[in-house]
Amino acid sequence: VHWTAEEKSAITAIWGKVDVAAIGGEALCRLLIVYPWTQRFFTSFGNLSNAAAIQSNAQVKAHGKKVFTAFGDAVKNPEGVKDTFAKLSELHCDKLHVDPVNFKLLGQILITVLAAHFGKDFTPNVQAAYQKLVSVVAHALAHQYH
C-alpha cells in the first residue's frame, strides 16, 4: 500500500490529539453495543448486559485502550502494518477465533468516534486517510485467516 505524505500527515495530526484510553474505551464500548454479537468474545469481562453496564465496565475500557495503543503502532508505521500485526493476527485467528469481519466493524466504529470527537478537524480527506488505514489494519489482522 502506498501512503502519500498528505495521508500520513492527516493521520498523525489527528492521532497526536487522541486520548487513547478515552477513544479506545469509547470505541470498544460502541462496538459491543452496536454489534452485540461481538460480546461473545468478551465473556470474561463480566456484566455486558446493557449499554450502561458496558460503558461502566473497567475491563472493556482497559481493553479498548490496549487495542488502540496497538493501533497507534500502525499510525507510526503505516508501511509496516502487516509485520506489526502478525502476532495479533495469529492470536485472533488461532486462539480467539474472531471472525475477521469484526476488525472491519471496529475500524468503522473508530472512524465514527474520531469524527464525533474532532468534528470540523475530521475533514473528508482525514476521513479518507483513516478509512485507508483501518482497512489496511483489518486486512493485516485477517491475514492469518487466509
UniProtKB/Swiss-Prot annotation:
Q: Name one Pfam family in it.
A: Globin
Occurrences of domain Globin (ranges): 2-146
Keyword flag NADP: no
What GO biological process terms are annotated to this protein in UniProt? hydrogen peroxide catabolic process
Keyword check for Methyltransferase: no
Q: In which tissues is it expressed?
A: Red blood cells.
Q: Which residues bind heme b?
A: 63, 92
Q: Which GO terms describe its cellular component?
A: blood microparticle; haptoglobin-hemoglobin complex; hemoglobin complex
Query: Which GO-annotated molecular functions does the record name?
Result: haptoglobin binding; heme binding; metal ion binding; organic acid binding; oxygen binding; oxygen carrier activity; peroxidase activity
Checking SUPFAM superfamilies in the record gives: Globin-like
Keyword set for this entry? Heme, Iron, Metal-binding, Oxygen transport, Transport
The record's comment on protein family reads:
Belongs to the globin family.
Assembly with partners or alone: Heterotetramer of two alpha chains and two beta chains. Oxygenation results in dissociation to dimers.
Protein name (database record): Hemoglobin subunit beta
From what organism does this protein derive? Erythrolamprus miliaris
